[in-house]
Amino acid sequence: YTQFEWVEAGIGSTGTTPGSFRLQHDILSKGKVDLLFVEAAVNDDTNRFSALEQVRGMEGEVRHALESNPEMDIVMLHFIYDPFIPMIARRQMPDVILNHERVANHYLIPSINLCQEIGERMQDGEFTWDDFGGTHPKPFGHKFYAAAIGHLFDEMWKGVSPAGTIEA
């Protein structure tokens, strides 16, 4: 089995602009990074970063990471929070996710749109927002996040570059 050394560098309520400035000190300075997860849809939205700031911030994180290790694998995640739920119900993707996806597409980074998946599952009556645990999920909600990441890894290990949304 692969031995992992985890660097937990998440700071709540920040987003990509502060994240791009913190990346070197809080993550890259700890040693060679082989796998990096990035997620900021909720905080870039709540902090009201402009579309340009969202793209620049996410690209700042991705580009700086790849400059430090061009072989680094990056996975972009898109989480869900209350204001995104009615948008997903109307089949409207939040602008912040579209902006971050511009960066993912440019750098050919796989992404997992958990916002869409969780929103659609709630629309289908599979569970409620309260069951899921809200913006900071309960263990029940985390199972969906973990399953989606596992599914992405399964697809990538098969040598498949997933097109579209990866689901749990």
Could you describe each region identified by the protein language model?
Residues T2, S20-T165:
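Alpha-helical cap/lid subdomain in secreted, periplasmic
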Residues T2-G15:
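A short beta-strand-loop structural module common to alpha/beta enzyme folds
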